[in-house]
Amino acid sequence: MIRSKIKSIEITEVPDLNPDSFVPGDFENFGCTFGLTVGPDDSDGGELFYLTVCTPRWLERACEKDGFVWGCHHLIVREYNLKTITEIIMKFVDSCSGDSWTDVAGKLSRIANWEFEGYRGQ
């Protein structure tokens, strides 16, 4: 049985990608992209998964601006709290297992955009 493990977490909106460097202007109205490197728990490597973390207010403003928001691969939280957000993500990732890495990655891609999502090998 293969189990997933987070190898690293980045936030793409900050130059150094360090989540500790990200401080939203409004903790109850923000949106940012988490880049997760996730792989099998028994190996060093991983693959990239991207997840938009945002608040309902941020979604509302995006809807006001554009009239709509695509909803796939979003984690919606009441306010920005890095510790809580990280715990939510880790709990889901740690719960994913399967007979192959493709099975596990498929489960992870339910909540985050997998770098190989939609890829069909020959």
Locate predicted features.
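C-terminal charged interaction modules
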Residues: 94-122
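Short helix/strand-capping turn motifs
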Residues: 2-97, 101
